[in-house]
Structure formats: structure tokens, C-alpha cells
């Protein structure tokens, strides 16, 4: 119950405030008709009700998503599964993001009465823990495919990154106290890389925060591809099921980016509930995939009972469980499929850059993520004002429809790619 309560608090990170655009040059004042004022009042009331409903639903779904994730970790880390230790640590490290988001969300609400999504410096720091998780998972798979397993260096790097994320928040707080200036929208890492004189809503994500989001999407796709490749290399097809299990979580990331792309618009508050739903579904599919993997590796219900009894004894009597020795699966020679050799998708970057050092590999991912961040952040401000005005008056239905396309199209393409890749001898002729 305590863990669920904490996750319900984390759902506060998905509350919304209305985006406020920066002031434009002085324009002649116009009289506003009374019926327009009445319509605006009704719209705001409807958006507020939708936001409250979405928040409540998201809180329940986020809370429900913890149990399947813990179940997934149990089967993943079971000695019989013989999963790469770096991957085990990476997926466990995700809990740092989950519980790191809680104080960030509470801080945004307590300090500014805003959502975490609208407090960039807290938002970026918290989300960076998710990006770090994905990096560790990718590096864990790279190590396993290279025939080595060194989780200690990954633990050290992840610990340093967590410290950096916390330090970045303290730097903003210290600067705040010195200037006595409220910083609800203070950019994370001082907005390094932001372009000046660009007309954006005040709650637009900074470049560093956008890079964190785009890198998370790219890294997760790369991890999906590496899991698929790992299945071929060790001759265990159940790892391909893990790739399928990861797919809803990638869609969850797309939903989050879509919401930020539209500047956290109140009429798109359904994105928060959808993101929570995709997270809960993804955690469940991941748990099922790991269950299949564990069963194929020899896990039985009697193992589960023994582990439960050992855990109970450890909690009540302080009895330490005996450490079970694990063996690293032997690598087998497997001819990559034609889709893998063609290197057509983001997920194939792991194979394309397999010979790079970790530093060079991550540097390439960072450069790619930065390019995508600039693209999504600064393309909307380039749209002519007449089109922007027309869009503003198009109505909530049009806005929701456009957001739905941003979410559904890449998700369907992702599903199509993995479906065609799973067909024997099939060759995918597209990209995401």
C-alpha cells in the first residue's frame, strides 16, 4: 500500500496548466463579444473536468503498473533465466526513475502549483533517470553480445548520473535563492543549446529536456533490436517475445512526447491517462514475456514457492538466502535475418555500431537525439502565424485527432516492422 500511495503521488506529475505564450509586440485591443467569453468559460470548465478525470485514471493505472514490473524483475533476475547482469541492473534501475519522480512532482506542485511537465528543471532531471535506465539496458545487451558481462561499471556510471541529476536541481535552487526569482519554467541545465528570440509558449521544454525525451525513445528502440539479436545469438527465441513485450512502453514514450509537442495542452489531458495505460500494459506484457523466458529456462511453480518461503524467512527471521550460481548462456553462431542485415530501422543501430566503443556509441546516440530534439522543438515556431491562428480555432476535436495520429502512426509502423521481421525469410522494406 505504501508503494501504491507513492505512485499515486507520482501521478501528480501529469497535472496540467494552460500554456501561456510569450507576449508579442503591442497590437490594437479588440472588443471581445460576450458570447465568446461564455464559450471560453465553458471550454475551460470542460478542460478542467477532463484533466481531473485523466489525473484520477492515470493515478490508478500508474499504481497498478508497479506489481507487474516487480514480477517481471523476479523472473528476469531468477538464476535459471540466465539473463545478462547488465540488463538486469538496467531494468531494476528504472525504479530510481519511478521514485525519483515523486519528490520532483511534489516539489513542482508545492513550489509553483504546477505540474512536473511544466517545471522544466525538475522535469528534465527526473526524466534523465529514465534515459540513464535505457542506456544501461542497451550497454548491458552490448556486453552480452560481446561475450562479456560487467555490471559493476554500469552500476558506477548509473550512480554518478543519479548524483548529477540531483546536483542539477540543487544548482537551480541555489540560483533561485540568490536571485529571489520564481523559476517554475527555469530550463534544466540552464537551457544550454536553446535558441534565443524564438516565440514559444513559456512552458515549452528546453533543449536538454527534449534531448532526454528523444534519447529515451531511440535508446528503447535500440534495446528492442538488441534483445531480438540476442535471441538469435544464444538460440533462445523467447527473447524475441521480450522485444514484443517492450513495444507498449515505447508507445508510452511516444504519448509523452506528443503531449509535450503540443505544449501540454489541457484539451489533450487524455494523453496522460493513455500514457499511464500504455505503461501498465507494457509492464504487464514485459512480465508475461519474462515469465515465458523463465519457464523455457526451467523455472517452475515449485521454484516460486521456494523463493516466496525464502523471502518470508528473510523478512521475519533475518535468514539470508543462499546465493545461487548463474551461468552465462553460450553464444552460438546464428546467421542474422535479412531484415537485420539491411539495417533499415532505429533498432538496428545496435548492430550497425556494434564495433564502436561505448563512449563513441553513446556519443552517436546523443548526436542523433539532439538532432531530433531541435527538430521537434523548433519546427512548430516556424509555422506561419495564419496557420497557427487557424489551428487555435480548429477546436479540441481537431487537436485530439492530430495528436492521435502522432501516436498511432509510428506505433502501427513499429508493430508492422516487428511482425514482418518475425516472419521466416520476410524482408521489411520501410522505416519508422
Model-derived segments and spans:
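N-terminal plastid-targeting presequences
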Residues: 21-432
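Sec-dependent signal peptide recognition
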Residues: 1-8
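Long, compositionally biased alpha-helical segments
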Residues: 10-12
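Active-site histidine-anchored catalytic micro-motif
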Residues: 15
Amino acid at each position: 500500500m505504501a508503494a501504491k500511495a507513492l505512485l499515486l503521488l507520482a501521478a501528480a506529475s501529469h497535472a496540467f496548466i494552460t500554456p501561456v505564450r510569450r507576449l508579442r509586440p503591442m497590437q490594437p485591443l479588440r472588443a471581445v463579444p460576450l458570447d465568446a467569453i461564455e464559450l471560453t468559460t465553458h471550454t475551460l470548465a470542460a478542460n478542467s473536468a477532463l484533466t481531473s478525470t485523466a489525473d484520477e485514471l492515470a493515478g490508478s493505472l500508474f499504481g497498478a503498473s508497479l506489481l507487474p514490473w516487480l514480477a517481471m524483475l523476479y523472473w528476469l533476475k531468477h538464476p535459471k533465466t540466465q539473463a545478462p547482469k547488465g540488463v538486469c541492473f538496467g531494468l531494476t534501475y528504472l525504479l530510481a526513475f519511478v521514485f525519483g519522480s515523486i519528490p520532483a512532482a511534489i516539489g513542482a506542485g508545492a513550489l509553483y502549483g504546477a505540474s512536473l511537465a511544466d517545471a522544466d528543471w525538475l522535469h528534465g532531471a527526473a526524466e534523465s533517470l529514465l534515459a540513464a535506465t535505457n542506456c544501461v539496458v542497451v550497454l548491458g545487451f552490448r556486453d552480452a553480445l560481446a561475450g562479456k558481462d560487467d555490471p559493476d561499471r554500469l552500476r558506477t556510471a548509473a550512480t554518478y548520473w543519479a548524483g548529477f541529476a540531483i546536483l542539477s536541481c540543487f544548482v537551480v535552487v541555489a540560483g533561485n535563492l540568490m536571485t529571489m526569482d520564481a523559476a517554475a519554467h527555469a530550463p534544466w541545465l540552464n537551457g544550454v543549446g536553446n535558441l534565443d528570440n524564438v516565440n514559444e509558449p513559456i512552458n515549452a521544454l528546453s533543449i536538454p529536456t527534449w534531448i532526454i525525451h528523444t534519447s529515451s525513445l531511440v535508446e528503447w528502440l535500440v534495446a528492442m533490436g538488441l534483445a531480438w539479436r540476442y535471441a538469435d545469438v544464444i538460440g533462445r527465441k523467447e527473447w524475441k517475445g521480450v522485444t514484443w513485450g517492450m513495444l507498449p512502453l515505447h508507445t508510452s514514450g511516444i504519448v509523452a512526447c506528443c503531449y509535450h509537442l503540443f505544449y501540454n495542452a489541457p484539451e489533450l489531458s487524455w494523453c496522460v491517462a493513455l500514457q499511464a495505460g500504455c505503461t501498465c500494459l507494457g509492464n504487464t506484457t514485459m512480465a508475461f514475456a519474462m515469465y515465458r523466458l523463465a519457464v523455457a529456462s526451467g523455472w517452475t511453480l515449485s521454484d516460486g514457492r521456494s523463493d516466496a518461503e525464502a523471502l518470508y524467512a528473510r523478512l521475519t527471521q533475518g535468514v539470508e538466502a543462499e546465493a545461487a550460481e548463474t551461468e552465462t548462456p553460450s553464444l552460438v553462431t546464428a546467421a542474422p535475418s535479412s531484415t537485420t542485415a539491411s539495417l533499415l530501422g532505429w533498432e538496428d543501430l545496435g548492430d550497425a555500431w556494434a564495433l564502436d566503443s561505448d563512449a563513441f556509441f553513446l556519443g552517436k546516440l546523443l548526436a542523433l537525439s539532439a538532432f531530433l530534439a531541435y527538430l521537434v522543438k523548433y519546427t512548430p515556431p516556424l509555422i506561419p502565424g495564419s496557420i497557427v491562428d487557424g489551428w487555435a480555432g480548429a477546436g479540441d476535436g481537431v487537436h485530439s485527432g492530430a495528436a492521435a495520429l502522432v501516436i498511432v502512426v509510428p506505433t502501427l509502423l513499429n508493430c508492422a516492422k516487428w511482425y514482418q521481421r518475425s516472419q521466416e525469410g520476410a524482408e521489411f522494406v520501410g522505416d519508422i
